[in-house]
Amino acid sequence: MAAERSFIAIKPDGVQRGLVGEILGRFERKGFKLVGLKQLTPSRELAEQHYGVHKERPFFGGLVDFITSGPVVAMVWEGDGVITSARKMIGATKPLEAEPGTIRGDLAINIGRNVIHGSDAPETAEFEIGLWFNPSELSDWTPSDQTWRVEG
């Protein structure tokens, strides 16, 4: 059985504030495996597809403007329960409601600048990974310390 994968993106505010290493480190220390990584400034088309579920919401235009305003670090992380675990690590969408110890709880204040995005379900992860990455951009590899990360 293939391990679960999740799409995680460090938004322009996180990149501009120099938080990439801090965030990557949290996922690595948790024991998840990085299988895709790139930095890009998203096109408007990509942003509109990514946030398509919010198209009719009043904040849609501002959200698209923000995510296309600078570089984003797009990642695919793999591991048992990575989607649920990543959401817990990220914290509540509204940073002031996020628990201390979460990425947003520690590193963000405002909902419009909440540093990071993470897939919320397997179907969403599959869609987002396919939107942001070509299959050839994902690495299938085994960390040398794999037996120390997970059983079996």
UniProtKB/Swiss-Prot annotation:
InterPro entries attached to this UniProt entry:
NDK-like_dom, NDK-like_dom_sf, Nucleoside_diP_kinase, Nucleoside_diP_kinase_AS
> What's its catalytic activity?
dZDP + ATP = dZTP + ADP; a 2'-deoxyribonucleoside 5'-diphosphate + ATP = a 2'-deoxyribonucleoside 5'-triphosphate + ADP; a ribonucleoside 5'-diphosphate + ATP = a ribonucleoside 5'-triphosphate + ADP
Q: Which residues form a coiled coil?
A: none
Does the record's keyword annotation contain Transmembrane? no
GO molecular function terms noted in the UniProt entry: ATP binding; metal ion binding; nucleoside diphosphate kinase activity
Q: What are the subcellular locations of this protein?
A: Cytoplasm
Q: E.C. number, please?
A: 2.7.4.6
Q: Which residues form the active site?
A: 117 (pros-phosphohistidine intermediate)
**What positions does the entry give for ATP binding?**
11, 59, 87, 93, 104, 114
The cofactors required by this protein are: Mg(2+)
Q: In which pathway does it act?
A: Purine metabolism
How does this protein assemble?
Homotetramer.
The text of the family note is: Belongs to the NDK family.
Cross-referenced HAMAP family = NDP_kinase
This protein is called what?
Nucleoside diphosphate kinase
Gene encoding this polypeptide? ndk
